[in-house]
Amino acid sequence: MGWGLLIFMVQIGDTIVSFDLFQEYFCCNFSHCRGICCVEGDAGAPVLFEEVEKLEEALEVIASEMTPEARAVVDEQGVVYNDRDGDLVTSIVNGKDCVFASRDENGGCICLIEKAYREGRTPWRKPISCYLYPVRLRKVGDFTAVNFHKWDVCSSAFIKGRRKGIRAYEFLKEPLIERFGREWYDELLVVAEELKKQNML
């Protein structure tokens, strides 16, 4: 596949990977953040066109578990909408809460789609953008930019990652493989090892 180091970016195949993905420590800390990333922000989670049908199929499974407000939004505009940048995103309630978010018995935010997936009620986990977070993808010409999004609501994840010695690319192994494939991820590991040899990590 081949790779090349750019200033603060690494090219792997047809992707350009942010150096932050290698450098930053990251490990989700749900017990601290309580899943706030599902209910904060001013737009829904990015959705691929081919994921819309999967969202609609998942809706049939989890509709009864959604809040009345979320069901009303979905009834009015569907499971997705175009945000101010024209990107397709999940529908939201009151300008911030994902319609597929709910609360567990301890008040933490959970994804109803992923809950159904873990319980074997749906074959699909959730949108790849959610699975990949804090990575965000963006098309740049013929390339896909693999960017690392730093958000203050994830501050505890940076602390936990550093404490455990887990880099972002390691924590995100499974979603990165799901999105880009095993060969791509193996190349990412080669890059990481080379960066370590050069004392860049």
Task: Tell what function each PLM region has.
Residues W3-L201:
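Short loop/turn segments that flank or connect secondary-structure elements
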